[in-house]
Curated annotation (Swiss-Prot):
Keywords noted in UniProt: Carbohydrate metabolism, Galactose metabolism, Iron, Metal-binding, Nucleotidyltransferase, Transferase, Zinc
Organism: Streptomyces lividans
Residues bound to Zn(2+): 70, 73, 114, 165
Catalysed reactions, as listed in the record: alpha-D-galactose 1-phosphate + UDP-alpha-D-glucose = alpha-D-glucose 1-phosphate + UDP-alpha-D-galactose
UniProt xrefs under Pfam families: GalP_UDP_tr_C, GalP_UDP_transf
Residues that, per the record, bind UDP-alpha-D-glucose: 154, 169, 332
GO BP field: galactose catabolic process via UDP-galactose, Leloir pathway
Cofactor: binding details: Binds 1 zinc ion per subunit.
Active site: 167 (tele-ump-histidine intermediate)
Pathway: Carbohydrate metabolism; galactose metabolism
The protein's name: Galactose-1-phosphate uridylyltransferase
E.C. no: 2.7.7.12
UniProt keyword Zinc present: yes
Length: 354
């Protein structure tokens, strides 16, 4: 992987990640872009104890532009990327919810092909995305304001995505996200109750012995969790516990693309041939880099994992009522996790079944 850092016309950082070491990225962005001054603040809810960021600037995001005006496509379309094509590119979000002392937001373009999706990538291309996520995690973790790095992809207009080009985002939070805090609390309680046991290890061992396993390799395992909140919710874990993407060894990095690409393609097949691509939310959960607030728990106790979910309002015919969320945020599923796992095994690639 070759990494090249440069600047856009408005001063934002842009980083190229190339498969070929001899790739040269020396184009200069000469667009008449005004420098954006974005401020944000993080407010803490005194009753719930969690935090929420907000952008203190007028809304101006690009909303569903035609393909010939996509700002994530290569040059020639008045866009952020100035070269004819790219492998993977990351740049600072022009309209961030986190900025300055409140963290940072970045956009990750998985490919220069506007009509592709992550599932269309080759294993080599997908590996490059993993390496880019890892590098950004390392870089952002060194910012004084950053406590947790959150890499994710939302796909589909149903999720609220406003650009069709295959891309994800990275939020570098100045606090520990609520879901991570809940996991750390449970981790600490389990460690105390068992005299040092690790909750993540226990959960993974139990799931691998059960009927909810969807896909398994030598170094990775995907399963529908026993207590899944969403109708189709898959958790993907490395079998060797590591706190973040930086901890993955070469064997795990090499196998990940094959496992993840098959998982994505299964989700695209669950509603049958000829159906449009399935919208989803995919997010990496990494250990916070700041001081953990739970006594007896360290970063190494946390387990890196990817949470992949299909929203309840997608394809209602297949997921009847999918999920009901009441005013008290109590999740109710109409698709049992065991049935969801069975369905995802049914649509395995023919080569995966052999």
């Amino acid at each position: 992987m070759k990494k090249t850092s440069t600047r856009l016309a408005d001063g934002r950082e842009l980083v190229y990640y190339d498969l070929r070491d001899d790739t040269v990225r020396d184009a200069v962005d000469r667009r008449p872009l005004e420098r954006t001054v974005t401020t944000s603040e993080v407010r803490r809810d005194p009753l719930l104890g969690d935090s929420a960021p907000s952008r203190l600037a007028p809304q101006g995001r690009t909303y569903h532009p035609p393909a010939d005006q996509c700002p994530l496509c290569p040059s020639g379309r008045g866009t952020a990327e100035r070269d004819p094509a790219y492998d993977v590119v990351v740049f600072e979000n022009r309209f961030p919810s986190l900025a300055g002392d409140s963290g940072r937001c970045e956009v990750v373009c998985f490919t220069s092909d506007h009509d592709a999706s992550f599932a269309d990538l080759s294993e080599e291309q997908a590996r490059l995305v993993v390496d880019a996520w890892t590098d950004r995690t390392s870089e952002l973790s060194h910012l004084p304001s950053v406590e947790q790095v959150f890499c994710f992809e939302n796909r589909g207009a149903e999720i609220g995505v406003t650009l069709g080009h295959p891309h994800g985002q990275i939020y570098a939070y100045p606090f520990t996200t609520p879901r991570t805090a809940l996991m750390l609390r449970s981790l600490a309680a389990h460690k105390d109750a068992t005299g040092g046991g690790n909750l993540f290890d226990s959960v993974l061992e139990e799931e691998l012995a059960g009927e909810r396993v969807v896909l398994e390799g030598e170094h990775w395992a995907a399963f529908v969790a026993y207590g899944a909140h969403w109708p189709y919710e898959v958790h993907l874990y490395p079998k060797r516990r590591v706190p973040d993407l930086l901890g993955l060894d070469e064997a795990a990095r090499t196998e990940f693309p094959k496992v993840y690409l098959e998982l994505l393609r299964r989700f695209d097949r669950i509603f049958g041939e000829g159906e449009p691509p399935t919208p989803y939310i995919a997010a990496w959960h990494q250990a916070p880099f700041g001081q953990l607030e739970f006594e007896g728990v360290t970063r190494d106790d946390f387990a890196l994992h990817l949470n992949f979910s299909l929203p309840p309002y997608v394809r209602q015919a297949e997921v009847p009522r999918g999920l009901r969320i009441r005013h008290e945020r109590v999740h109710q599923r109409d698709v049992p996790p065991e049935r969801a796992a069975e369905r995802l095994r049914e649509v395995a690639d023919v080569h995966e079944r052999e």
